[in-house]
């Protein structure tokens, strides 16, 4: 059997070498030897999101944050800060038809892996774990205590009064209402009490509506998340309905209250022209 010419074998071997992947060799050739002394200096005040390595894995560089460009090649995907990943941006991909034909590489941005709110040890809710970590690094740079994640989701907080009830003046037979808006996490439970004081000044409360036929209580969630709005409707108004009414909110983290007075008169001319601030008819 006749052997193939030596020139033909050499040509085939050369062709195989040309077909081999060149990514790893070309990458190492582009990077060259690592010389830490020649690495550019980092910012004087340090990196806000910590450090990572450059595309060659040699020089320290500042890690990139959410929404900042990253990537450009497989070796460059380590530029994002810990807890983030380099994801192609659909918005930036539009109009890049030339990229498939040897044009510029598709750009990408750093995106947080945990895209849900978290509660920090400082009692503040952060939109993501990445933003909590960034806040912790800023706190440490100021010499403050690091912030850690306490739980997933928003931080629990005691109730607070968003809109308190207002004092009311009106005549007997009228229809009046008090309203109160509260917020808290978990969502508070809102109740109404009528405050009574005896001759010695001792206060006691009567849970409403009780057995009053002319009084109704209504409560609904909102207008914002974890908010509750409640109303007391009195119709028809009588002298017995005069007094102090308390809006009381409570949850597992605490309680809050606000009060307003209903003053009942026989005729409109008995209502003083200058009432306390926030009073209404």
UniProtKB/Swiss-Prot annotation:
Q: How is it modified after translation?
A: N-glycosylated.
**Leader sequence segment:** 1-25
Induced by what?
Answer: By retinoic acid.
Instruction: Please cite one Gene Ontology biological process associated with this protein.
Output: cell adhesion
The entry's note on the tissues where this protein occurs is:
Expressed at high levels in lung, kidney, small intestine, testis and uterus and at moderate levels in liver.
Q: Where in the cell is it found?
A: Secreted
Impact reported for residue 77 to G: In RNA edited version
Which part of the chain is the IGFBP N-terminal domain? 27-113
Q: Which residues form the Ig-like C2-type domain?
A: 159-263
Q: Which GO MF term does the entry hold, naming one?
A: insulin-like growth factor binding
Q: One Pfam family this chain carries?
A: IGFBP
Q: Which residues form a coiled coil?
A: none
Q: Which residues are glycosylated?
A: 170
The protein's assembly and partners: May interact with VPS24/CHMP3; the relevance of such interaction however remains unclear. Interacts with CD93; this interaction plays a role in endothelial cells angiogenesis.
Q: What is this protein called?
A: Insulin-like growth factor-binding protein 7
The species is Mus musculus
């Amino acid at each position: 059997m006749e052997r193939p010419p030596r020139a033909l074998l050499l040509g085939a071997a050369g062709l195989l070498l040309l077909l081999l992947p060149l990514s790893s060799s070309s990458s190492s050739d582009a990077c060259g030897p690592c010389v830490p002394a020649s690495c550019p200096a980092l910012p004087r005040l340090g990196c806000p999101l910590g450090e990572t390595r450059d595309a060659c894995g040699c020089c320290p560089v500042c890690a990139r944050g959410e929404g900042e460009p990253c990537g450009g090649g497989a070796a460059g995907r380590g530029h994002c800060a810990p807890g983030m990943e380099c994801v192609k941006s659909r918005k930036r991909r539009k109009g890049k038809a030339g990229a498939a034909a040897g044009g510029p590489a598709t750009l990408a941005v750093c995106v947080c892996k945990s895209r849900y709110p978290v509660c920090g040890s400082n009692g503040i809710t952060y939109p993501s774990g990445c933003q909590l970590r960034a806040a912790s690094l800023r706190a440490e740079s100021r010499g403050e205590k690091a912030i850690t994640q306490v739980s997933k989701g928003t931080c629990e907080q005691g109730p607070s009064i968003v809109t308190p009830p207002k004092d009311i003046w009106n005549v007997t037979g009228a229809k009046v209402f008090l309203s109160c808006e509260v917020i808290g996490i978990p969502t508070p439970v809102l109740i109404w009490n009528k405050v009574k004081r005896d001759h010695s000044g001792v206060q006691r409360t009567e849970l409403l509506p009780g057995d009053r036929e002319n009084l109704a209580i209504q409560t609904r969630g909102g207008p914002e998340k974890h908010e509750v709005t409640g109303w007391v409707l009195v119709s028809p108004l009588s002298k017995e309905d005069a007094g102090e009414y308390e809006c009381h909110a409570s949850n597992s983290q605490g309680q809050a209250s606000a009060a307003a007075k209903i003053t009942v008169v026989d005729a409109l001319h008995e209502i003083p022209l200058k009432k306390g601030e926030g009073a209404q008819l």
